[in-house]
Amino acid sequence: MPFSASDRHDITHLWEKMAPNVEFLGEEAMERLFKSHPKTKTYFSHLNVEHGSAAVRAQGAKVLNAIGHASKNLDHLDEALSNLSDKHAHDLRVDPGNFHLLCHNILVVLAIHFPEDFTPRAHAAFDKFLAAVSETLYSKYR
């Protein structure tokens, strides 16, 4: 999926805003996912997924750090996310529909915490980016 110059700018800008707060923002995105889609908790049965848990904070940070890595590799998402894609498809066997659910919650968190930066154009760019990340992650399911 090609990204325009303005897409790249907006993706990079939003990631720079997110990067210092990956634990907090990631935790909120994960908690929103679990609250709005409780069935997603089944993939984390080995963790304490209650509000404020260290496990949710760590998982959220892991997710957002992977997104940060992807944001620096927009032209090579397949290579950048290959190991993560393999893990989700073959080891964790996560329902690929859950990627979309998490992406939606990440967008909600961005809109809440960065309203000045989350313009309609930035929203569209980051949504496009997260869709490309999701598509890359579930590419190994085929």
Curated annotation (Swiss-Prot):
Q: Per UniProt, where does heme b bind?
A: 88
Domain Globin, first and last residues per copy:
2-142
Show the Gene3D superfamilies listed in the entry. Globins
Keyword annotations of the record: Heme, Iron, Metal-binding, Oxygen transport, Transport
Heme as UniProt keyword: yes
| An annotated GO BP | hydrogen peroxide catabolic process
Provide the tissue specificity. Red blood cells.
One GO cellular component assignment for this chain's record is: haptoglobin-hemoglobin complex
| Positions of O2 binding | 59
A molecular function annotated in GO for this UniProt entry is: oxygen carrier activity
Coiled-coil boundaries: none
InterPro entries (UniProt xref): Globin (IPR000971), Globin-like_sf (IPR009050), Globin/Proto (IPR012292), Hemoglobin_a-typ (IPR002338), Hemoglobin_oxygen_transport (IPR050056)
Q: Which family does it belong to?
A: Belongs to the globin family.
- Relate the assembly described in the record: Heterotetramer of either two alpha-B chains or two alpha-C chains and two beta chains. The two major hemoglobins, B and C, associate upon deoxygenation to form a trimer of tetramers, BC2, that has a much lower affinity for oxygen than either component alone.
Q: What does this protein do?
A: The alpha-B chain is a component of adult hemoglobin B.
Protein name per Swiss-Prot or TrEMBL: Hemoglobin subunit alpha-B
Organism of origin: Aquarana catesbeiana (American bullfrog)
